[in-house]
Amino acid sequence: MDMSQLMFRDGLMDGERVLVTGGGTGLGKEMAEGFLKLGAEVHICGRRGGVCEETAEALMSAHGGKVVAHGCDIRVAEAINDMTDQIWMNHGPLTGLVNNAAGNFISRTEDLSIRG
């Protein structure tokens, strides 16, 4: 993705801190890259922490900026709390969230538990 593919001005997200769940691959990775190019500090998380680490390194190598990887299973409430506490303490408050992580659960929404 190059800047000509983005419809927003350079630096639009300078000073912002965004968390993208499921940010190691696919659409989450693409959105994380877009936020990074617009100037945001980007945090990505996913169950496969190693994949997130590789993505963070690749994005920073390609575009500079700051991408922080977190291994986190969002189905575990305590893991989410630990991750967001760590972000807050080490980096400051989040200013944006893309809840991209997904699962394929064939069920009525009201029948789903917090764990899917």
Task: List the predicted regions and their residue ranges.
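Flexible N-terminal pre-Rossmann segment of NAD(P)-dependent oxidoreductases
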Residues: 1-19
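Rossmann-fold scaffold of SDR-type NAD(P)-dependent oxidoreductases
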Residues: 21-22, 94-102
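NAD(P)H-binding Rossmann-fold N-terminus in SDR/SDR-like oxidoreductases
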Residues: 26, 30, 104
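Aromatic pocket-lining residues of Rossmann-like dinucleotide-binding sites
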Residues: 35
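Conserved glycine-rich Rossmann-like NAD(P)H-binding loop of the short-chain dehydrogenase/reductase
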Residues: 38-54
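Conserved amphipathic alpha-helix within the SDR
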Residues: 57-60, 67-71, 76-92
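Conserved mid-core segment of classical short-chain dehydrogenase/reductases
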Residues: 81, 104-116
